[in-house]
């Protein structure tokens, strides 16, 4: 078990009009990125978007599953978990996200 980290599930829409974090529903973060899913461009855009949205360095966002899928899992510092859920107050508690 990795102390200090947690796993967040993400659903990605590629080739969108803008890069945007859309919602957090049932522990799954929905994001849109402008990049196409070619040669890792969309994955890089997702990492950059999450880092900017959460105000953390890109190297603190690690893609651990779903490299070629719309559904991805990223490893994030546990310290930002509460911040993420504060951005979407209508969602369930921070414990809805998966722990690592």
UniProtKB/Swiss-Prot annotation:
InterPro entries linked to this entry: DUF167, YggU-like_sf
Source superkingdom: Bacteria
SMART domains noted in UniProt: DUF167
Disulfide-linked positions: none
GO cellular component, as recorded: cytoplasm
Entry's family note: Belongs to the UPF0235 family.
Protein name: UPF0235 protein TC_0667
